[in-house]
Amino acid sequence: MATGRRKANRTKKEETNWQERVIQIRRVSKVVKGGKKLSFRAIVVVGNERGQVGVGVGKASDVIGAVKKGVADGKKHLIDIPITKSNSIPHPIDGVGGGAKVMMRPAAPGTGVIAGGAVRTVLELAGVRNVLAKQLGSNNPLNNARAAVNALSTLRTLAEVAEDRGIAIEKLYI
């Protein structure tokens, strides 16, 4: 029985590094035979500020339940991103999610996160401190968050590019 207790403590410690932020809570309705059934949809971003981030959506009859489901969904859809020493992204990148397009560019140390809305939340919880980002197309928070995650998931380090090409990192730009 003592081993079960230790495992429970370990999982609690692991869960404390995750931060979650609610991007949007929206009341939605479903038309049924007896009238309209109201429920809530929560869009939640989960991250550890050390290169892992995920976007989740939860629906429930109450707000708290929707947020809990959103957090669980976000943890299921986590991605790892490479972060440079200057807490930026390695290279310029574009992402698409639905009708939303997101453009991200690395920035010099001290610039901060210059982004709006859902994209800013995703970048902050991913641990990116210096970046320039622009939302293009849709201003839907869910699609913009998904576009940001799509962009971040395609980031690659110099070592990964050199390995894919089968050459040494030193010869990459010669």
UniProtKB/Swiss-Prot annotation:
Keywords recorded for this protein, A-Z: Ribonucleoprotein, Ribosomal protein, RNA-binding, rRNA-binding
Biological processes per GO annotation: translation
Pfam families associated with the record: Ribosomal_S5, Ribosomal_S5_C
Molecular function terms, GO-annotated: rRNA binding; structural constituent of ribosome
Presence of keyword rRNA-binding: yes
Residue ranges of every copy of the S5 DRBM domain listed in the record: 18-81
Family statement drawn from the similarity comment of this UniProt entry: Belongs to the universal ribosomal protein uS5 family.
Protein name stated in the entry: Small ribosomal subunit protein uS5
Gene name, Swiss-Prot/TrEMBL: rpsE
